[in-house]
């Protein structure tokens, strides 16, 4: 006779034990990471003089990988390079692993556990520098960085309107960013 174990008893979860037995612990931990990240991003957006409603919507866009733009054109919200750069930095949150910030804060960080994030970070730096210096040197650094992080985070938002059509490359970057673990709910969980 074959015994089938119910899916909720399969071991796993944030602590590596039975997810069902640790559901409350895992739920609270994940909720606090999402909540604190969202509040931190809203705080950052308020520091760079974005309206509260725009900051609220953009924080949901960055944390959950897209979908909450309050206007048709993002350039109506972002007025200077500092705002574009901060938005690009906050787009890095859903690109990297879910517990990366948690492990850094709790001093449990190890490069061995986050090799994929190291590769993605290296890819972002290399592609941004390559595009800025060789492919589209007339475009500003913040716009290039924003286009790369937006594509890799699969959010699909941009203010970049190039003379040179790089749509195919940005679509490939979106595929690469979407194929790394999971971006269906924003943060990546491994």
Annotate each PLM feature.
Residues 1-190:
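Membrane-proximal intracellular helices of multi-pass ion channels
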